[in-house]
Amino acid sequence: TQEELLQIRKQPELEPERDEASENSRLALEEMGICAVPFYKTVEFSENLAQKECARLEAQLQKAGILDALVVSETDFNCIRKSCPEFLDTVLYAHETGNGTFEGLQVSEELDAALKETVYRILTNLYEAEEGQGISLGADGWFRQGILTGRADKEGEPEFVGALARKRRKELKIRELESKICCAK
């Protein structure tokens, strides 16, 4: 547990668990100079959402396979498709701007212009009601992505969407481990 605590303290942020193939694919993209950012780092929750709504929305994104999917520019998307036969991960990419009016998420201001444009296109393909070709994320926890439909909810706070949420999650994990270590002595 002491070792785990040291490892967590060294990490800038805690990330969702990934399989080895995804980790290797992300390292390969980085080595190729491809900017690939997990979706949860490209967006922030809208200010008008309550904490419970944020947690539910994050749970929907996670269950639908969207939360940790990579966001890339159009150029990098085409490069991955053509030049990375070993790529084994998920990319969230919208070729065209949609007409979705989903207001639960907004583009992070920290992104470069190309990624901002990509995230904007993704967000315009999100809907609150089940309509259109995009992804629906209902306020009641139901979601639809193509033929995949489900419902998600989460107690507590969001853990990944938003820099503050990621910081709080890391601090909480450190406190939990410190408490375990202290109790074990």
Residue ranges and their predicted role:
Residues T1-E23:
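Extended, EK/Q-rich alpha-helical coiled-coil segments that serve as long dimerization/scaffolding arms
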Residues A21-S179, C183:
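Hinge-like oligomerization/junction regions that interrupt long coiled-coil arms in large cytoskeletal
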